[in-house]
Amino acid sequence: MCATFELTGERKINKQGVRLYRIRATRDIAARGVRAGDLGGWVSSTHMTTGELRIAKDAWVSHEAEIFEDACVTDSARVGGHARVCGHTMISGYARVDGWSRVYGRAHVFETAVVDGNARVGGNARVLGAAHIHDHVQVRGEACVAGEASLYDRVCVGGQARISGSAYLCGRAVIAGNAAIAEDAYFQVFETLETFEDSVELIRTALPNGEYGAQVRIGTWIGDIGSVVDQLFLCWQRHQHARCSQSEWMERALQIRSRC
């Protein structure tokens, strides 16, 4: 396959110490609205170590985006902005990686998925379907985000977790292990409190009737607001060496409950 781009004489050393070259289109790429002669982003070479083209004939890398190591952009995918794609990653299908996002490791972003903002996708994670990953979201490990799922703010998805359907996650939610969130789920950590040695997160969730409910996460425990006092009492029993009395601990529990 003939390359649709060439390396120009413009070069730089990036923050990882890799020499990069700005690219220029050698023919029109209608799928990406690119004209012959247009300047693009930065790559470390025209081909990967496997001998395959780093950028497929209908794909494009634009603006200040960087593609290096054994990363590639195939099919009709696009990488732009100040995005950085490295490792053994693949951006394929009609996927788009933009903003200041990073895709690394052996991650795969494909179909019509979008990764932008300051998002990070790494490890063996997969982002596919029409999923949108924004802001400071992190997807790593063996996690998979698919369907029309949307992740915002500082959500972190790891382990072998799977997010799909029209799920909407925001705030500081952490989804890991073998967790699965699907359909029209709404999950938001809207406040994180510190209660001595235990982190307490207030979580807002969508109820079947369309209204919003609330839950609380204390460590690995998640339960209804009505159980907060009992659960924090168990925390106090577990941490009796903490420099606080039972009454002080329970007073804090009631304060947290009142804020839910």
Where are these regions (language model features)?
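Structural signal for interior beta-strand "rungs" in well-ordered beta-sheet cores
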Residues: 48-49, 53-62, 66-193
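Terminal amphipathic alpha-helical/low-complexity segments used for targeting or macromolecular assembly
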Residues: 1-58, 64, 82, 94, ...
